[in-house]
């Protein structure tokens, strides 16, 4: 039974989609004014992994993730670069698609843009005005937060506490327009020279929160199964989405809210963000780090937990991935001399691993326990591959299971070239050196023995480890 932690109820709940066998899932996408950084990628990877697991369990997943292609940040960035807002959006949407493809994130079923849905946004805002939930003022349109009885339910904050915080962030201009400090913009009047659209309230553009309400309900329906994003979106963005959507449709907006933990960096574990200027873009890091390693590093931490980004943690991920790849290569190598022996014992054991993996992942997508099962499977694979007589059917069954489970983490397992290259040997020697330093002699011997099977002999000398090919 799959359970998911629902931010709205603050507890794990059995996952039951509205329509059996189909999951409608919306993930808040980026504001496309710059390259995505590692923190943005964490959200994309976390929920791509959720999607992959749902598909693994047999669900058809309608996965919608938007692009915010007009807002204050985009207007500012376009002016700084001397290009139009649409040109800026096109530049960074293309970059997003390239970067996410590099880290093996499946394209969404739909990637709608805010600017493609202006007509629907205006209609949605008009509906809220007619119902008394919104009011126009000098070209802007604001939402009456207090009119929505459940405002604050997602973030668990009282209206009084929210009012104190909101009062501190209301500009002088907004003081004269808003009926209440809690009210937020649905539509913003255009300033001179800004990109804008005609509306019943004059030229303007949509507010950020209304974009996601409109696009999620337009493409997935009035009630969606999963709405996901980073923890920083819980309030005000997702809180406001609930208020807007449920006021307009009169129906429950989202059945399960999922929020991923932050990526932290530095000795003080600061949240990685553009505002703190401590971010690293995916565009830059994949020039130095194997994209599969970055993906594996991100995908193997449970989505609600924070991730500490560091070179040491990346190195650990590299070593663990090498360990899995080496086991896969050993199996491939043994296919050459495998016989047609019995496979039943192996397939029975694989069923146990498969069930163990599902049990782990069914617990709120617990990838850390899931990958622990993969490591157990790898250990079993290595022991089997070292036997004198192996079955071809068994070898292929183990490989198939490894490929299937690793694909859920977004990692492609493929056989390396039969002739192991020098770079790979050096990586394994370095991994062996670390294992010996940590007194992990079992892993050290495993690397040495696996290389020997591939015709590589290691020699430990006072000057370091050398190797030769038989």
Swiss-Prot record:
Give the catalytic activity: tRNA(Cys) + L-cysteine + ATP = L-cysteinyl-tRNA(Cys) + AMP + diphosphate
Q: InterPro entries under this entry?
A: Cys-tRNA-ligase, Cys-tRNA-synt_Ia_DALR, Cys-tRNA/MSH_ligase, CysS_C, Rossmann-like_a/b/a_fold, tRNA-synt_1_cat_dom, tRNAsynth_Ia_anticodon-bd
Quote the cofactor binding remark: Binds 1 zinc ion per subunit.
Q: Which SMART domains match?
A: DALR_2 (SM00840)
Lineage, top-rank taxon, reads Bacteria
This enzyme's EC code(s): 6.1.1.16
Motif segment ('HIGH' region): 30-40
Which GO biological process categories is it annotated with?
Answer: cysteinyl-tRNA aminoacylation
Which residues take part in binding ATP?
A: 274
- Keywords recorded for this protein, A-Z: Aminoacyl-tRNA synthetase, ATP-binding, Cytoplasm, Ligase, Metal-binding, Nucleotide-binding, Protein biosynthesis, Zinc
Signal sequence, renumbered to the chain: none
Motif segment ('KMSKS' region): 271-275
- Which cysteines bridge via disulfide bonds? none
Q: What cofactor does this chain's UniProt record say it requires?
A: Zn(2+)
Q: Which compartments does it reside in?
A: Cytoplasm
Q: Name one GO cellular component term.
A: cytosol
**Chain residues that bind Zn(2+):** 28, 212, 237, 241
Recorded GO molecular functions are: ATP binding; cysteine-tRNA ligase activity; zinc ion binding
Q: Which family does it belong to?
A: Belongs to the class-I aminoacyl-tRNA synthetase family.
HAMAP family (UniProt xref):
Cys_tRNA_synth
Subunit organization: Monomer.
**NCBIfam families according to UniProt:** cysS
- Protein name, please? Cysteine--tRNA ligase
